[in-house]
Amino acid sequence: MHVTRPKSSKGRSRPMITNSSMIYTPSQPSALSPQPPAAAKTKDKSNQSLRSRAILRRSSQPTTDILTEAYDRPPEEPVSLNRYRVLPSIEKKTSTDNQKCSQCVSRHRKCQHTNARLDVVSDSTPPEESDLLLAIRTPCGQRFKRSFRPSDQLKGVLSAAEAEFGDRFDNCIIETMDVPRRTFSNLTMTLAQCGVLNKSVLCISHDDSEMDLT
């Protein structure tokens, strides 16, 4: 049965569409989704099986090149886990410390022995007498300086004054200028016995007691 289609605006008739063309048959393959042939699939499967077999053979049986490379390789040096220098043992350090201590003790004993010898020598020798610088004043008021020893007597001081000025000092005594003043009529006494110190002043005076008796 043919159905007439109305004409378009331009006067042309539209094509006829049958009902048979509108029916969808799932058994027919679609032109938009092409399927690969079956022969190509079987070929890919065979290639994959051959590759897997070759990989298994290589992994199970190592080649001679790999073995020779492993034997020819030089041995690796052991890696030290300690970055710091190894310290000496405690026993060695203790022995060296003991040696140093013994050396110090021996040196100290030698020094003590030497000092003891020096002390004995200094004690055996008599100490040198230091000179006394004295200022002497005559009865006339004249002065002079002279060095004497502590073991010198007072009459030696009187003789030095007579030699210095060329006069005779008979019936004289010697006095000190210290406070209180001390008078010595016994001219045989030494300066040490009189307690005369360094840089002292001694005065030669006439003995007034003898002058009164005359």
UniProtKB/Swiss-Prot annotation:
Is Lipid biosynthesis included in the keywords of this UniProt record? no
Biological process GO terms, please? Answer: cilium assembly; determination of heart left/right asymmetry; ERAD pathway
Against InterPro entries, the record matches this protein to: Ubiquitin-like_domsf (IPR029071), UBX_dom (IPR001012)
Q: Which Gene Ontology molecular-function terms are recorded?
A: ubiquitin binding
* Residues in UBX domain copies: 127-204
Keyword terms of this UniProt record = Cell projection, Cilium, Cilium biogenesis/degradation
Question: Which ranges are annotated Basic residues under compositional bias?
Answer: 1-13
Question: According to its UniProt record, where is this protein located?
Answer: Cell projection, Cilium
Q: Where is it mainly found?
A: other
Q: What happens when the gene is disrupted?
A: Defects in left-right asymmetry during embryogenesis, due to defects in ciliogenesis.
- Which stretches does UniProt call biased (Polar residues)? 16-25
Where are the annotated segments for Disordered? 1-79
GO cellular-component terms in the record? cilium; endoplasmic reticulum
Gene3D superfamilies on file? Phosphatidylinositol 3-kinase Catalytic Subunit, Chain A, domain 1
Ranges annotated as biased composition (Low complexity)? 49-60
Q: Where are the transmembrane segments?
A: none
Q: What family is reported?
A: Belongs to the UBXN10 family.
Q: What does this protein do?
A: Required for ciliogenesis. Acts as a tethering factor that facilitates recruitment of vcp/p97 to the intraflagellar transport complex B (IFT-B) in cilia.
Protein known as: UBX domain-containing protein 10
Which species? Answer: Danio rerio
Q: What is the name of the gene encoding this protein?
A: ubxn10
